[in-house]
Amino acid sequence: MNIKRAKEEIEHTVKAYLAKDALGEYAIPAIRQRPILLMGPPGIGKTQVMEQVARECGVALVAYTITHHTRQSAVGLPFIRQRNYGGRDVSVTEYTMSEIIASIYAKMEATDLKEGILFIDEINCVSETLAPTMLQFLQCKTFGNQAVPAGWVIVAAGNPPEYNKSVRDFDIVTLDRVRRMDIEPDLPVWKDYARAAHIHSAILSYLELHPQNFYQINADVDGTQFVTARGWEDLSNLLDTYETLGLQADEDLIREYIQHPKIAEDFSAYLDLYYKYRDDYGVEEILAGQAKPAVFARLLQAPFDERLSLVSLILSGLSTRFTASHQADAVADSCYAFLRETKKALATVPEDIPDGSAEMFHQQIADYDAETQQKREAGLLSKDALTTRLQVLAVLRGWEGELRRANAAGTQDAFDLLRGQFRSLADARETAQQAASAALEAAFDFMEQAFAESQEMVVFVTELTVNPVSHAFLTENGCERYFQYNKDLLLDHRKAALQQELAAEQRRHGGV
């Protein structure tokens, strides 16, 4: 199965294992809660999936790479205890609590989340001394003499033997006690994730043209050459930062992430062209509605991969504006909700307390900050959600400064000042939305003039549809031409599907 399907199965499993009956007991007893065993090549996204599932299910996550541990840290350290058995004093060996079990309790204490996921990675690559402990863990859900706490779902991951020389096969007794999921790389599924994760547009465009280079692991006389989904994502983060800093990524740098020489060389050449197209075609000018006439003449002679790269660059520019609009909208909505609570709280502040409104507002901000840090520690905030909260905190602290400088005479004056500050924020949101809409209209103007209803327009409209950022913007703000092209595209797909059905029907009847 692909990683998206695996994520859905894990999410459903967590919900099922943590479901309770009318008496408050777990509907599926712990003994029947089979651990999940994910088997797949390295760098496919198994660890990230666990973070997403924990966040979406609202539970804690404790993750360990078991190859980093010894038997002592997994089982605990031995110590001597005096016991009396049958009237005879004896010395017996007992063990301290496993570091892994202790970390679960520490996580529960730090996050106040009593249920969660224990994720053990590379479980089939452990040393010979630790292998029996891992079998006991999967079969009995214990480390040494300590059981995994109730309400914690066990998920383990490993690599097939063709990817790791240290792999140990599980026996049938162990496999009969787990739920095994075999995961394979899937570019279309990864691209869905990549769009939401804002993977660099050059990488998405390159993989659109060269899908065979998405994931490869090849062994030859020179060693193992590989490229993984993790490598592409990590490279994307670096490219974004390099662009911000005005630095250039060369082939040597790319080889550090894409450890497949031919693919690294190919992508490096493509990246150079990608930046060249951005400058030569003037993408920012296109999105400002000021495309140069020479651009259209050049496109008439350009090969398909160059035209597709330009479409990707235009989509990237739009995505940046859609993201800014979405972020401004999210910050404004959060601040509005915060002010509603502020209005209620101000009603309880006595008018005769000096600076009472500002102190109350300060305490509200402190509570919001503490809540943010608690959610962050628990892993319950996505990257976008955390960014929104941090921006909201920055806005609120600015408002607090204005409130203190104004030295408002009463609670009503204080709220009027805050309401005025919010109007400025709402204006900024409107400006971001208008800028994104104007760029979208300019993009359609260019696409119609340059490509009309060709394959490039199909790619453009399709990407606007499947990208979650652009889809959300279009749903909220609309665009007449997008809806028209999307409608025509759907009609074309339905017509093609109908023609295929008719052709298949004719073949079944011998062409009669």
Predicted regions, residues:
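AAA+ P-loop NTPase catalytic core and its hallmark functional loops
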Residues: 1-212, 220
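Alpha-helix capping and helix-coil boundary motifs
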Residues: 2, 184-186, 243, 303-304, ...
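Conformational switch/transducer regions in large eukaryotic molecular machines and scaffolds
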Residues: 35-37, 57-68, 80, 89-116, ...
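Terminal-proximal interaction/regulatory segments of ATP-powered molecular machines
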Residues: 300-512
